[in-house]
């Protein structure tokens, strides 16, 4: 009887309990928008929480980098997707964000039965059950994990792009519209990776 209970407990702990998805870079003025989806069992949710997984915005860059390989190792599956600057400018940021999420989901080996999405907006192209959770990255380990993976993936790309776009301090602002970044655009001009649709609002394009 005891063995049966232990077996049932192990099965419960190893069963997929959460599939969370989040985006990063939606509000940036430079570079693509990234999304990540992470599939977790009950057991590995607990382990990741013990390792310090939480809302990526509350973690240092060093801690996020430390956690990514742990998340990828402990996830049952994961996917990363992105949408280009051209897609953002042509389709609008909402559609482009949805597209990056769908691309991340297509990387999964199996379609999840339920998806937990960070934020209030429905993922319209998704044909399946979804729950939208405001501030989900502070409430669900799967969303927090997805947020960290997406954030580090995008930040790594920004560091690589710094070599080609050295006049904009991309390594520092990560493509976001800081006062310093906007000042450098006025000085050096708009590049092919700046979001023209965003810069029009600032009268910079």
Swiss-Prot record:
A divalent metal cation binds at residues 22-23, 118. One of its GO terms (molecular function) is RNA-DNA hybrid ribonuclease activity. GO terms for cellular component: cytoplasm; ribonuclease H2 complex. It comes from the Bacteria. CDD domains: RNase_HII_bacteria_HII_like. Keywords: Cytoplasm, Endonuclease, Hydrolase, Manganese, Metal-binding, Nuclease. Its EC number is 3.1.26.4. PROSITE patterns: RNASE_H_2. InterPro entries: RNase_HII (IPR022898), RNase_HII/HIII (IPR001352), RNase_HII/HIII_dom (IPR024567), RNaseH-like_sf (IPR012337), RNaseH_sf (IPR036397). It catalyses: Endonucleolytic cleavage to 5'-phosphomonoester. Its main location: cytoplasm. Manganese or magnesium. Binds 1 divalent metal ion per monomer in the absence of substrate. May bind a second metal ion after substrate binding. Disulfide bonds: none annotated. Its cofactor is Mn(2+); Mg(2+). Belongs to the RNase HII family. This is Ribonuclease HII. The gene is rnhB.
